[in-house]
């Protein structure tokens, strides 16, 4: 068996197209232009690349894009004042503070200062609480992308056995809640779980988000299972360079899985696309409009 490749690049492009069409519709029918504000603190090169990508894709979807760049030594009070200003700006429907923040800034305080209605990263405790209670909420973008990718293989996740390896607040925990809301049967595990291979071998859906290069092996996977690899790890090569791998030993797992996401080209492609989805949903909710068809 050779696994079907779940092409995140193609699926994300289709999702961005759906968002753009919905943005065009709400502009035409309601005079509403969704707006996303991204706050970048410091000059971390990787963060700058991510912010540029978000800006480009936001504009391509027909949304307004607002960038706010602050120095690494900015006072927390100044950052909080900017967030408060964005909270009250009617042209801004989504606020994203690029993480990680420089030392000296309290991430939890900063995230909690964002209006939950504009928290398009889905990290505010209000949204996390609603998600855990099965209520409508803005969900973190990476877990949301995992669900969308899964549904390209299984249009309904109801009744499927799923395992989430990883318990971070950014991916693992919210992914569990999203799966429960889809009526999947969910096991959450982590690097210290006992008999992890045996637990994983029972799952129809495997989500690897533990941050350990190629941890999930072939003999962990039930034949025909769907494997979603959230990991992004750089490992050295024999030539003294590095290469990007996930948390799944891709080549060997692809021989037994029914479907699998590659790294790169899988989950990572979905994150910004889902950010656009959340921004559109937030804009419609704030304006009192029905939930968009995406």
UniProtKB/Swiss-Prot annotation:
Binding site for NADP(+): 166-168, 191, 232
GO CC aspect terms: cytosol
One of the record's GO molecular function terms: methenyltetrahydrofolate cyclohydrolase activity
Pathway: One-carbon metabolism; tetrahydrofolate interconversion
SUPFAM superfamilies: Aminoacid dehydrogenase-like, N-terminal domain, NAD(P)-binding Rossmann-fold domains
Secretion signal span: none
Alphabetic keyword roster: Amino-acid biosynthesis, Histidine biosynthesis, Hydrolase, Methionine biosynthesis, Multifunctional enzyme, NADP, One-carbon metabolism, Oxidoreductase, Purine biosynthesis
GO terms under biological process: L-histidine biosynthetic process; methionine biosynthetic process; purine nucleotide biosynthetic process; tetrahydrofolate interconversion
Catalytic activity: (6R)-5,10-methylene-5,6,7,8-tetrahydrofolate + NADP(+) = (6R)-5,10-methenyltetrahydrofolate + NADPH; (6R)-5,10-methenyltetrahydrofolate + H2O = (6R)-10-formyltetrahydrofolate + H(+)
InterPro entries, A to Z: Aminoacid_DH-like_N_sf, NAD(P)-bd_dom_sf, THF_DH/CycHdrlase, THF_DH/CycHdrlase_cat_dom, THF_DH/CycHdrlase_CS, THF_DH/CycHdrlase_NAD-bd_dom
EC number(s) on file: 1.5.1.5, 3.5.4.9
Pfam families for this protein: THF_DHG_CYH, THF_DHG_CYH_C
Domain of life (superkingdom): Bacteria
Subunit-structure text: Homodimer.
Similarity section: Belongs to the tetrahydrofolate dehydrogenase/cyclohydrolase family.
Function: Catalyzes the oxidation of 5,10-methylenetetrahydrofolate to 5,10-methenyltetrahydrofolate and then the hydrolysis of 5,10-methenyltetrahydrofolate to 10-formyltetrahydrofolate.
The protein's name in its UniProt record: Bifunctional protein FolD
Record lineage: Bacteria, Pseudomonadati, Pseudomonadota, Alphaproteobacteria, Hyphomicrobiales
